[in-house]
């Protein structure tokens, strides 16, 4: 596996490749990330991964400086997955001058849920993903469903900007107790780690209620919010939305069996966790 930091060297290395499968990450890789590499291999060859902690998608009170950086360990994991190239640029490589141009998602998708609680987050994501796509020029890129809203925004962005890349969605990987794998799980204290699976269990109960015929979605959302708060969580949102556009479904759409997803974000101690389940 070649480890490359220069954009020009990356382009030279990939010149002539027309089936490249790309997996962008911020590093601190776990089994969830590695499952993306394996899925990428099913859709293209060679597989290219990137590791770049993107300052543009962190807010002023977020954890950019303490975000775990474990490059050597990540390299060893990617070598075991037979990744062809790891693109690991420095901040100077990616942003040699102030990034004055940004890719802004529409407010109807980028300003809700995560976008409401993390202003500027999706503009940072869209900008860096567009730049990475320009560097790698993949045929396929793999994104996890755990970041459901991000997946939808990136997919729509590629469609509307006519980027010639297929976005493949990967299922969320979970620990045995149901907690979705995340680099931020390492911030949890032992007691918080024991409590953390309750987020997924709460979403499962919401899903079961909807599938069981409950149609008062607002009541389900409020009950879930209250349940988590009573256990010491600080929920940002619990929302049942249409999978197609993350808009709340109408009564007619519910009766017609519109595909739904329940999404949540909540703080447990100092750690903010997100999760979702398709319904």
Swiss-Prot record:
GO cellular component, one term: cytosol
Residues reported to bind beta-alanine: 57
Locations listed in the record: Cytoplasm
Residues involved in (R)-pantoate binding: 57, 150
Catalytic activity: (R)-pantoate + beta-alanine + ATP = (R)-pantothenate + AMP + diphosphate + H(+)
Pfam families per the UniProt record, alphabetical: Pantoate_ligase
Keyword Oxidoreductase: no
Gene3D superfamilies the UniProt entry points to: HUPs, Pantoate-beta-alanine ligase, C-terminal domain
Active site (catalytic residues): 33 (proton donor)
Pathway(s) where this gene product acts: Cofactor biosynthesis; (R)-pantothenate biosynthesis; (R)-pantothenate from (R)-pantoate and beta-alanine: step 1/1
Any Gene Ontology biological process: pantothenate biosynthetic process
CDD domains documented for this protein: PanC
Family to which the UniProt record says this protein belongs: Belongs to the pantothenate synthetase family.
Biological role: Catalyzes the condensation of pantoate with beta-alanine in an ATP-dependent reaction via a pantoyl-adenylate intermediate.
Protein name per UniProt: Pantothenate synthetase
